[in-house]
Amino acid sequence: MKMMTAIVFTLSLTVSAVALAAAPQLSVKKTITIAAAADKVWEASKNFNGLNTWHPALASDELVSGTNNTVGAVRLLTLKGGGTVKEKLLGFDEAGHRYRYAIIESVLPVSHYRSVFVVTSLGKDKTLVTWSGRFKRKNLGDSPADGENDKAAVDAITGVYTSGLDNLKKIVEAPGA
C-alpha cells in the first residue's frame, strides 16, 4: 500500500511538472512617453505602496508587511471592480528609477508573474516609462477555457499596463502637476 501511494504521489508530481513546463511563458511590454522630467515622473510613480494614486483600476493599496520601497514589502491591491491582488517587492533602485515585483496571489488569470517598472529620461522634459512582465496563464491545463487561456492572461496584463500608464501620463502632464 505504501508503495502504491508513493507511485501515485510521484506520478502526480510528474504530471504537475509537465503541465507547468508545457504552459508557455508569456510576456507583455508597454511603454509611454511623458512630457515631464524623469524625476517628476518617478516621484509620482515610485511608491510601491501608492499604485492606487495613479492607477485608475484600484480602490486601495495597503502595505500588509514590510516597509514601503524596501525589498520584501508586500502590498494588497483592491480592485474597484472587486477582487484583490497581493504583490511582493523584489527589487527597488531609487537612483536607477526602477522596481521589480511579483504577484503572489491574484484574481487575475496569471501565475508565475514577475514585472519590472522603469522610468528613463529622454531629455529635459521627456521621459519614457516601461512596464513589462513575464508570466504564465493561471490555468496550466492542456485545454483552458476562454478567459483562462493565454489570450486572457495577455489581455488582462495589457489592460493593467495600458490603463495605468495612460493615467500616469494624464496626472503628470496635467497643468499645475
Regions found by a protein language model. Name each.
Residues K30-I32, V85-G91, E105, Y113-S121, ...:
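Hydrophobic/aromatic beta-strand elements that line small-molecule binding cavities or substrate pockets
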Residues T53, E62-P109, S163-A177:
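Glycine-rich portal/gate segments that line the openings of hydrophobic small-molecule binding cavities
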Residues A6-S16:
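Bacterial N-terminal signal peptides
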Residues A19-S65:
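Hydrophobic ligand-binding cavity/cleft-lining segments
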Residues A35-D39, L90-H97, V118-L128, K170, ...:
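A short, structured loop/turn motif at beta-sheet edges
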Residues A37-A38, A44-N47, V85, A153, ...:
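Stable alpha-helical elements in mature extracytoplasmic
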Residues Q25-T33, V74, T84, R98, ...:
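Intrinsic-disorder/low-complexity, polar/charged segments enriched in Ser/Thr/Lys/Arg/Asp/Glu/Gln
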Residues L128, F135-A177:
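A conserved amphipathic terminal alpha-helix motif
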